[in-house]
Amino acid sequence: MEWHSKFSGPNTSPGFLLWQATQSWQRKVGKALAEFDLTHVQFVLLTSCKYMIAHGETVTQKKLASFSQTNIMMVSEVVRTLEKKGFIERSKNPQDKREVLLSLTEIGGEKVTAALPIVEKIDQAFFAAAMKKENFLSGLQELLKHE
């Protein structure tokens, strides 16, 4: 069977390398978050919600999906799970009954406060070598601009 690719192999394919790095990073974060009864996605949405609230934003599922650049249907499912766990509360917007507002419970806020430093420590260790490279963060930011 012949191999036809612009890249000489997996180690020169940026997409494949990004995929592998993402999988490795997510495994490390997921393992650490298990002790908090959170998946990586739950942590990201819970932390994003807390960040948005702390910065004076009214949080809806649509705004949370936009902020975290995730699918609205997935956000809806994850928020439902976080609500069942007692980490998030949903309520109707008094100004617009069609809109559901999100807020963190005390327990949800405590989960973020406890888990965030651990995830940040993992991020620092995992990305340390790449952060030494000039333009690493700006390169990632540039990738997100073209979505």
UniProtKB/Swiss-Prot annotation:
Q: Which residues bind DNA?
A: 61-84
Give every HTH marR-type domain span.
Answer: 11-147
Against Pfam families, the record matches this protein to: MarR (PF01047)
Please cite one Gene Ontology biological process associated with this protein. regulation of DNA-templated transcription
InterPro entries tied to this protein: HTH_MarR-typ (IPR000835), MarR/SlyA-like (IPR039422), WH-like_DNA-bd_sf (IPR036388), WH_DNA-bd_sf (IPR036390)
Known PROSITE patterns for this protein? HTH_MARR_2 (PS50995)
- Please give the SUPFAM superfamilies that the UniProt record associates with this protein: Winged helix' DNA-binding domain
Reading the lineage from the top rank, the first entry is: Bacteria
Keywords per UniProt: DNA-binding, Transcription, Transcription regulation
Q: What range does the record give for the signal peptide?
A: none
Q: Does the keyword rRNA-binding apply?
A: no
Q: Which GO terms describe its molecular function?
A: DNA binding; DNA-binding transcription factor activity
Q: What is this protein called?
A: Uncharacterized HTH-type transcriptional regulator YdcH
